[in-house]
Amino acid sequence: MLRVGVLVSGGGTNLQAIIDAVKSGDITNASIEVVISNKKDAYALTRAKENGIAAESVCIKDFESREKFNDALIEKIDSYNLDLIVLAGFLVVLPPELIAKY
């Protein structure tokens, strides 16, 4: 079973489609472990919680530099021991370290 993390920025319509596909069996051998947003108020986080999925936010405004934000994002993702990251409307340029890792 693949442990999947979904990165989002907004309402989460793409996330909902993925959740629905997992529930219906259209996507097999995968479990959404966490939804991470760069916005604390993203409705996608509500969608995650309503479906029993961990919901986290890592907001760039909470950090004094982009490098510290990148480090925090990678640390948050790593804490879930994920096999795969899905970008579902994540409106942040990914740090090269994250791309190399996943």
Language-model features and meaning:
Residues 1-102:
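One-carbon transfer enzymes
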